[in-house]
């Protein structure tokens, strides 16, 4: 190793996927490609320019680097960067129906849910998972009703800002 070089860093980067890998994958499949772990608007724009089907805005649970920004912080920036060109899925921090509501308002087309389902499965098996799904949906519908949103399409960033009518 030369001065200032890190064997660990070099090894991690050696195995990290590149934009060339995305292009290679596009060349061997006709399946839609969705990239996970996109947090920066520049990366989102690059992915959109390559024609991927979607992005999963994720910080991998913050476990890889604990100072990684929260997905809710970066989602609006990523959404603005791609301007509706591709599907955005948010992964991380979804625990309640109001979290789903906020993610949709901030630009997500869908959310991924992990831990709540695992906890529900461990506690009560398949019935626990069904109950967790029902809770998320009920909480989302309540948040929609209280915000005056009759459909998912009506959930916009404005739904997160109190108005004179709600004061």
Label every model-predicted segment.
Residues 139-167:
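Charged C-terminal helix
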Residues 93-94, 148:
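A short glycine-centered flexible hinge/capping loop motif at secondary-structure junctions
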Residues 70-80, 121-141:
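C-terminal helical cap(s) of enzyme catalytic domains, especially alpha/beta-barrels
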Residues 17, 124, 147-150:
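Short coil/turn linker and secondary-structure boundary residues
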């Amino acid at each position: 190793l030369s001065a200032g070089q890190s064997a660990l860093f070099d090894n991690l980067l050696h195995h990290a996927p590149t934009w060339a890998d995305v292009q290679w994958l596009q060349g061997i499949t006709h399946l839609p490609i969705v990239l996970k772990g996109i947090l920066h608007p520049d990366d989102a724009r690059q992915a959109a320019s390559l024609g991927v089907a979607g992005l999963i805005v994720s910080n991998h649970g913050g476990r890889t680097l604990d100072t990684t920004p929260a997905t809710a912080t970066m989602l609006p920036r990523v959404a603005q960067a791609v301007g509706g060109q591709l599907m955005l899925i948010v992964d991380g921090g979804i625990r309640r129906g109001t979290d789903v509501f906020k993610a949709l308002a901030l630009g997500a087309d869908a959310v991924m849910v992990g831990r709540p389902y695992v906890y529900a499965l461990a506690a009560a098996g398949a019935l626990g998972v069904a109950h967790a799904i029902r809770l998320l949906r009920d909480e989302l519908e309540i948040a929609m009703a209280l915000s005056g949103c009759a459909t998912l399409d009506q959930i916009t960033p404005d739904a997160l800002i109190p108005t004179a009518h709600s004061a």
